[in-house]
A protein has these predicted regions:
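N-terminal secretory signal peptides that target proteins for export/translocation
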Residues: 1-4
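Bacterial N-terminal signal peptides
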Residues: 9-18
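Electrostatic cytochrome c docking/interface patches
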Residues: 19-37, 49
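Short, solvent-exposed mixed-charge patches
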Residues: 24, 109-110
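The canonical Cys-X-X-Cys-His
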Residues: 33, 38-46, 101
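Axial heme c-ligation environment in periplasmic c-type cytochrome domains
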Residues: 51-60, 75-109
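Conserved strand-loop elements at the edges of beta-sheets that form or border functional pockets
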Residues: 63
Length: 110
């Protein structure tokens, strides 16, 4: 039975690591995040804005969980997630900016 304990232990360590990452994320301000998403709105079709590139598929980002937005923007910032435009956007944001953007986008309906 000791072989069954290793996967459980490994799973617990991964879970703890993800909680540690979230614990280090600053609290986000949805009000400030709204201002920061100005450049996002044309491409991602945030309600009230016309999509600037109707023939180019981009993901809908409104209503996403804060964790999803934080992880995606952080990965673009680090260069581990690839897309030239989004990497440039991600690199322009601080951790606080990313938390604020996540707070705003997660407050909107999908």
């Amino acid at each position: 039975r000791p072989t069954h304990r290793f996967p459980l232990l490994a799973g617990c360590l991964v879970l703890l690591a993800s909680f540690a990452t979230l614990a280090q994320t600053p609290a986000g301000s949805a009000e400030r995040g709204k201002q920061l998403t100005y450049t996002c709105q044309g491409c991602h079709g945030v309600t009230g804005y016309k999509n600037a590139y109707p023939s180019y598929h981009v993901p809908k980002i409104t209503g996403q969980s804060p964790e999803y937005v934080i992880n995606a923007l952080t990965e673009y910032r680090k260069g581990t997630r690839k897309h030239p435009t989004m990497q440039a956007q991600g690199q322009s944001f601080s951790e606080q900016d990313i938390a604020d953007i996540a707070a705003y986008l997660s407050s909107l309906k999908k």
